[in-house]
Amino acid sequence: MKIAFVWQGVSGRYGFWKDGLYSAMKHIEEKHEVRYIEPWEEVMPDEIVLYWESACTINGKDGENYKRIQQLPNKKALLFAGGPVQKEWFFNFDHVFVEGEFNKQELYALDISCSIAFGVNEEIFFPEKQQKTIDGFMQATFAGWKRQGLFAEALGNKGVLCGRYQEEDQAAWLDSERAFRLPELPAEAVSKLINASHTVVNTSAYWGGGQRCTLEAMACNVPVIVMSDSPKNVEFVAESGAGIVCDPNADSIRNAMEQVKGKDMVGRDYIMSKWTSKHYADNLLKFIENA
């Protein structure tokens, strides 16, 4: 079968990430022909479309790109990248893949065909014996919904943030100056930083996503701390026991760090049981091979 994998940014940052989806698509390439394109590029009539995007993009500056893919006559699935949901945003997609149970139940309530497909690149993110030199780490684009300012308030210069600076959302960068900050780095470097950390502290808010950050920490057997108002991350910690949930304030975060620091974690076993790139690929293939 022929597949058009569509993502705005596929010609740049997608390859830089080498995340679970990148690795999942490499598995799919072993069985099918895959072409990686931007949403404004031509899609062939015989291609099955996999489109990675937030549905709310339809109302933003790139809305015309979203609508163009949405209106294609091809068989197509949306790989939902997070954010709010409205039923009409999903019209004309044959299926929607989500990253966890929270979003699946949201879409079920809207009577939208959906299933879970998600995971990490377990070949890059794995436990390594390293000296722990960082109290807390977080990898995420600097954005209001990631709350890097809260991370910096809780950890100060004992915390390390790593992510892309956004000119259009400068507050997260300006508010986090007390922490040590790094630009977006290749996956291999991020894995080294996770393994050098006592904890991963994911301060993402309700709409903040951050599930990849949570699962990559678990893949490295590093305790992850997530916020109680971030249900998409809470579900992974609750199911795995590989971390702790705390309230989104500096004192609660510091207390949580003390509770889990130095404890043996079972995150890697949890990842290998259901959240590897192979699991990710197999779930995508269920749609592709029945399209």
Regions found by a protein language model. Give the residues of each.
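Acidic donor-binding loop of glycosyltransferase active sites
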Residues: 195-209, 222
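Short hydrophobic beta-strand element within catalytic cores of glycosyltransferases
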Residues: 223-228
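N-terminal pre-catalytic "stem/leader" segment of glycosyltransferase-like enzymes
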Residues: 1-65, 282
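Short alpha-helical segment that forms part of, or immediately flanks, the ligand-binding pocket
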Residues: 191, 214-219, 234
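A charged, aromatic-enriched C-terminal amphipathic alpha-helix characteristic of glycosyltransferases
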Residues: 247-248, 258-290
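Acidic anion/phosphate-binding donor-loop and adjacent secondary structure
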Residues: 87, 107-114, 118-134
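Conserved catalytic-core segment of nucleotide-activated headgroup transferases in glycan assembly
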Residues: 14-21, 122, 131-187
